[in-house]
């Protein structure tokens, strides 16, 4: 993986509803955690195919300071409802923090255009890597 230079400070993750945790502040954890931010939608087939990798990375690297946060930015209106999102998280076995980004505020702040997209934020709060789509899992882990 070729890391980007430290030019882009990661925007804070704000949202309508948080699941599996209280709101996560990257600023409060600066110097402690590397963040993997997964932009996804539970109704997106490509996003569902990435979940085993995201969950595996969380399991393998959380003790080394990796913090995974899902940003659920729905494509369809039916995906906006908190109860529906909560049910999807339970059915998919997602236990890491997820924020509902119904108005695409976080999506736009990061300049995301495609589902799924993974963003790696270093311990200093800079965006160092961004990856779109279903491929490149092994590259991402290097």
Name each model-derived stretch.
Residues 1-28:
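N-terminal "domain-start" segment that seeds a small globular fold
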Residues 9, 35, 40, 67-69, ...:
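Conserved Rossmann-like nucleotide-binding pocket used by diverse enzymes
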Residues 11, 45-46, 52-56, 63, ...:
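Proline-centered helix-kink/hinge sites
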Residues 18-23, 40, 57, 72, ...:
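Tryptophan-centric aromatic hotspots in well-structured domains and transmembrane helices
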Residues 25-48, 54, 68:
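Short active-site neighborhood of thiol/selenol oxidoreductases, capturing the structured segment around
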Residues 31-35, 64-67, 93-96, 123:
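Loop/turn elements at helix/coil->beta-strand transitions in domains of secreted/extracellular proteins
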Residues 48-92, 102-108:
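Structural microenvironment flanking redox-active thiols in thiol-disulfide oxidoreductases
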Residues 90-96, 100-142:
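Thiol/disulfide oxidoreductase modules built on the thioredoxin-like
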């Amino acid at each position: 993986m070729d890391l980007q230079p430290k030019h882009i400070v990661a925007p804070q993750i704000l949202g309508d509803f948080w699941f599996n945790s209280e709101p996560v502040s990257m600023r409060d954890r600066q110097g402690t955690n590397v963040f993997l931010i997964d932009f996804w939608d539970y109704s997106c087939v490509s996003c569902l195919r990435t979940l085993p990798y995201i969950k595996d990375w969380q399991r393998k690297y959380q003790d080394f300071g990796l913090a995974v946060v899902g940003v659920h930015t729905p494509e369809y209106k039916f995906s906006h409802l908190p109860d529906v999102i909560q049910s999807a998280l339970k059915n998919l076995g997602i236990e890491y923090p997820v924020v509902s980004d119904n108005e695409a505020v976080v999506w736009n702040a990061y300049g995301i255009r495609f589902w799924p997209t993974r963003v790696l934020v270093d311990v200093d709060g800079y965006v160092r890597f961004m990856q779109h789509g279903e491929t490149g899992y092994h590259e991402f882990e290097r």
